[in-house]
Amino acid sequence: FALSWRSYKHTNSQFLYFAPDLIFDEERMRQSAMFELCQGMHQISLQFVRLQLSFEEYTIMKVLLLLSTVPKDGLKSQAAFEEMRANYIKELKKMVTKCPSNSGQSWQRFYQLTKLLDSMHDLVSDLLEFCFYTFRESQALKVEFPA
C-alpha cells in the first residue's frame, strides 16, 4: 500500500517507486520475479490517481488494511480489535464528509475507498505468500561455516 502511495506521489503512478534508487518502469516489472504482483500494485497506484487520494484518506486506509491482517493464531481480544476497526471506519467516513471537494458525494467517495480496500485482499495475500516464500528460499540457501 505504501509502495502505491509513493508511486502516486513521486511519479503520478507512472512507475513503481520502491525507493529513490529503485524505480520500476513497465520493462523492469516484466523482468522481475514478481511481475504479476507489480502489476497489481501499479493498479492500486493508478486508482490513487483516479480518486485523487488525500494523505489523510491514505493513512486511515493503511490502518484499516493493517487491521484486516489477523495473525494465524488469532487475537487476544477480538472485541477490542473489532472496536478499533470500527473506530477507524468512522474516521474514514468523517474524513470523506469533511472534504469540501466531496460535498454531496461523500457516500459515493466512501464506497469507492472501501471498494478499493476490499479489492486489495487477494493482492495482500499474494504479497505475503511471495515474501514468505522468498524468506524460506533464502533460509534454504544460507551457508553455515564451521567454527
Curated annotation (Swiss-Prot):
<feature type="binding site">
    <location>
        <position position="6"/>
    </location>
    <ligand>
        <name>aldosterone</name>
    </ligand>
</feature>
<comment type="function">
    <text>Receptor for both mineralocorticoids (MC) such as aldosterone and glucocorticoids (GC) such as corticosterone or cortisol. Binds to mineralocorticoid response elements (MRE) and transactivates target genes. The effect of MC is to increase ion and water transport and thus raise extracellular fluid volume and blood pressure and lower potassium levels.</text>
</comment>
<feature type="binding site">
    <location>
        <position position="134"/>
    </location>
    <ligand>
        <name>aldosterone</name>
    </ligand>
</feature>
<dbReference type="GO" id="GO:0003677">
    <property type="term" value="F:DNA binding"/>
</dbReference>
<feature type="binding site">
    <location>
        <position position="6"/>
    </location>
    <ligand>
        <name>21-hydroxyprogesterone</name>
    </ligand>
</feature>
<comment type="similarity">
    <text>Belongs to the nuclear hormone receptor family. NR3 subfamily.</text>
</comment>
<keyword id="KW-0238">DNA-binding</keyword>
<keyword id="KW-0963">Cytoplasm</keyword>
<keyword id="KW-0754">Steroid-binding</keyword>
<feature type="binding site">
    <location>
        <position position="6"/>
    </location>
    <ligand>
        <name>progesterone</name>
    </ligand>
</feature>
<dbReference type="GO" id="GO:0005634">
    <property type="term" value="C:nucleus"/>
</dbReference>
<feature type="binding site">
    <location>
        <position position="134"/>
    </location>
    <ligand>
        <name>21-hydroxyprogesterone</name>
    </ligand>
</feature>
<keyword id="KW-0539">Nucleus</keyword>
<keyword id="KW-0805">Transcription regulation</keyword>
<dbReference type="GO" id="GO:0005496">
    <property type="term" value="F:steroid binding"/>
</dbReference>
<keyword id="KW-0446">Lipid-binding</keyword>
<keyword id="KW-0804">Transcription</keyword>
<protein>
    <recommendedName>
        <fullName>Mineralocorticoid receptor</fullName>
    </recommendedName>
</protein>
<dbReference type="InterPro" id="IPR050200">
    <property type="entry name" value="Nuclear_hormone_rcpt_NR3"/>
</dbReference>
<dbReference type="GO" id="GO:0005737">
    <property type="term" value="C:cytoplasm"/>
</dbReference>
<dbReference type="InterPro" id="IPR035500">
    <property type="entry name" value="NHR-like_dom_sf"/>
</dbReference>
<dbReference type="InterPro" id="IPR000536">
    <property type="entry name" value="Nucl_hrmn_rcpt_lig-bd"/>
</dbReference>
<keyword id="KW-0675">Receptor</keyword>
<feature type="domain" description="NR LBD">
    <location>
        <begin position="1"/>
        <end position="147"/>
    </location>
</feature>
<feature type="binding site">
    <location>
        <position position="134"/>
    </location>
    <ligand>
        <name>progesterone</name>
    </ligand>
</feature>
<dbReference type="Pfam" id="PF00104">
    <property type="entry name" value="Hormone_recep"/>
</dbReference>
